[in-house]
Amino acid sequence: MTLAYSKIKVEPREVELKNKPQEMFLASPKGTVPVLILENGRVIDESIEIMIWALTQSDPDGWLSVGQKDKCHELIHLNDIKFKPILDNYKYPQKSEKKDPLYYREKAQEYLYKLNSLLMKNHFLLGNHINMADVALFPFIRQFYMVDPQWFAQSGYKYLHAWLQFFLDSELFLTVMKKR
């Protein structure tokens, strides 16, 4: 989404994760997606770093707000360290230790509550306009939602649900998804 927002032209390539192309490993030995290869040959292979790079190229609405930098990075770090492992187990309980998606949904409650509480005060996570944290966390909340949309819609996270719906209905998201 950030690349599209910043109007960065890219050549997307679908990668079958079970059969990664050799070119991908040549560009980034980590073998993980995403990988962005710039015209000058520089490789950026971390989502957040790609977002920051794109926003330093063009950020018409101030998503990379300097005043919110520490809070933004704190939320993203919390998502990556705490929520992402829970999300993976919730989405794929058969691969998890507990094998019970409800167990992992319960484990996610503290994080979801924190985000919902932030959204009770503002339209977006860190204020009343979109910030990089919103766009970075949106895909993860969307994945969580997709496991059981009915539960999510009926949960007590009405502010988080409204925030998610805002992004799901956004022209930017719909345009990016249409290109796939």
What are the roles of these predicted feature ranges?
Residues 117-128, 172-177:
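Surface-exposed helix-capping loop/turn segments at secondary-structure junctions
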Residues 20, 68-71, 104, 128-137, ...:
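Short, conserved alpha-helical segments within structured domains
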Residues 158-180:
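Long hydrophobic alpha-helical segments typical of transmembrane helices together
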Residues 57-61, 147, 170:
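Phosphate/oxyanion-binding loops and surfaces in catalytic or ligand/nucleic-acid-binding neighborhoods
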Residues 150-158:
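Catalytic and substrate-binding regions of cell-wall glycan-acting enzymes that process beta-1,4-linked
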Residues 78, 114, 139, 143, ...:
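Alpha-helical scaffold segments in carbohydrate-active enzymes
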Residues 1-110, 116, 123:
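GST-like domain detector, emphasizing the conserved glutathione-binding G-site
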Residues 125-150, 167:
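GST superfamily/GST-like fold recognition
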